[in-house]
């Protein structure tokens, strides 16, 4: 059964959920939660923490596929840029892990 990882990226809080297809065609939640980074850490350090924690999650559950929330237009450019950086780190981690 295929295990899918869904990710809602952010620098302070990145949400995730792992679901598996059930025999009846429905979805079964396997795990869900958030990856948190400390507010007092530098931006580069927070991105490294995000990468490391996401890699640990991938190594524990071995999802086959993933979906990452796309950016939406934000009035706060600083926030939009930070979320874009987090999304890039997530996409890098997924690619290096061989996840579609």
Positions of the model-derived regions?
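Phosphate- and other anionic-substrate recognition elements at nucleic-acid/protein interfaces
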Residues: 1-100
């Amino acid at each position: 059964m295929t295990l899918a990882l869904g990710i809602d990226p952010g620098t302070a809080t990145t949400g995730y959920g792992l679901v598996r297809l059930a025999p009846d065609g429905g979805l079964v939640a396997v795990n869900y939660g958030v990856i948190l980074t400390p507010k007092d850490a530098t931006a580069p350090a927070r991105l490294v923490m995000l990468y490391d924690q996401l890699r640990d999650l991938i190594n524990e559950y071995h999802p086959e596929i993933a979906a990452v929330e796309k950016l939406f237009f934000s009035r706060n450019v600083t926030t939009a840029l930070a979320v874009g950086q987090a999304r890039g780190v997530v996409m890098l981690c997924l690619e290096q892990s061989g996840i579609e």
